[in-house]
């Protein structure tokens, strides 16, 4: 039968593995942080597609605005010319 104390002591191999794990974690912690920051920046950054869509939408609105006023003014000019012909 084993003693109660024997459960608390760890094998030297396990202690060594734990030490290596701690050192490895300390080394990779800045790398993990940098990777997380990169992923977050990529996730929140506005992409080229979004910028292109916004520019296309603005251009379409300006074109519609211009077409509306062009057609509205051109019909007024045509009606004025018809009145002058009489």
UniProtKB/Swiss-Prot annotation:
Q: Which GO terms describe its cellular component?
A: endoplasmic reticulum membrane
What does the protein in this record do?
Answer: May play a role in cell growth and maintenance of cell morphology.
> Do the record's keywords include Ligase?
no
Per the record, the similarity remark reads: Belongs to the TRIQK family.
- The scientific name of the source species is Mus musculus (Mouse)
Instruction: Please identify the protein, giving its name as recorded.
Output: Triple QxxK/R motif-containing protein
Annotated gene: Triqk
Provide the protein's localization. Endoplasmic reticulum membrane
Where is the major localization of this protein?
A: endoplasmic reticulum
């Amino acid at each position: 039968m084993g003693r109660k104390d024997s459960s608390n002591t760890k094998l030297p191999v396990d202690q060594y593995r734990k030490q290596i794990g701690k050192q490895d974690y300390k080394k990779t912690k800045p790398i993990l942080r940098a990777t997380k920051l990169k992923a977050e920046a990529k996730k929140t950054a506005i992409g080229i597609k979004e910028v292109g869509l916004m520019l296309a939408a603005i251009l379409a609105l300006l074109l519609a605005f211009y077409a509306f006023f062009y057609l509205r003014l051109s019909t007024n000019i045509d009606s004025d010319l018809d009145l002058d012909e009489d």
